Amino acid sequence: ASFAEAPPGNPKAGEKIFKTKCAQCHTVEKGAGHKQGPNLNGLFGRQSGTTAGYSYSAANKNMAVIWEESTLYDYLLNPXKYIPGTKMVFPGLXKPQERADLIAYLKESTA
């Protein structure tokens, strides 16, 4: 199912998901720097593999996807299938509600 069919996202629920499943490797605050994964500040509208100062896989750079709700929704279902060769080891979020919640949180927290 596509993002157009996704349930409405709850940013508060998304923040909990981020803290338990994403924050070990990612930051969202401007100027927070990179961890194992890149800082996600300014994520929406940015091309994959282009965050300054982070060493991306060739797969992530070559995919050249623009991160928006619809691309993140598909990516977060199964990152390794969406971008084969990505360094992101996260297996994905199978539940549409969890993906919608996380995207709602990321829209607020990375702007």
From Swiss-Prot:
Q: How is it modified after translation?
A: Binds 1 heme c group covalently per subunit.
The keyword Coiled coil is assigned to this record? no
List GO terms (cellular component aspect).
Answer: mitochondrial intermembrane space
Q: Which residue positions does N-acetylalanine occur at?
A: A1
Q: Which Gene3D superfamilies match?
A: Cytochrome c-like domain
Tell me the domain of life.
Eukaryota
Annotated binding of heme c, by residue: C22, C25, H26, M88
Keywords, alphabetical: Acetylation, Electron transport, Heme, Iron, Metal-binding, Mitochondrion, Respiratory chain, Transport
One molecular function GO term is: metal ion binding
Pfam families cross-referenced by the UniProt entry:
Cytochrom_C
Query: Which locations, inside or outside the cell, does it occupy?
Result: Mitochondrion intermembrane space
Main location class? mitochondrion
Entry function:
Electron carrier protein. The oxidized form of the cytochrome c heme group can accept an electron from the heme group of the cytochrome c1 subunit of cytochrome reductase. Cytochrome c then transfers this electron to the cytochrome oxidase complex, the final protein carrier in the mitochondrial electron-transport chain.
Q: Give the similarity note.
A: Belongs to the cytochrome c family.
Q: What is this protein called in UniProt?
A: Cytochrome c
Q: Which organism is it from?
A: Arum maculatum (Cuckoo-pint)
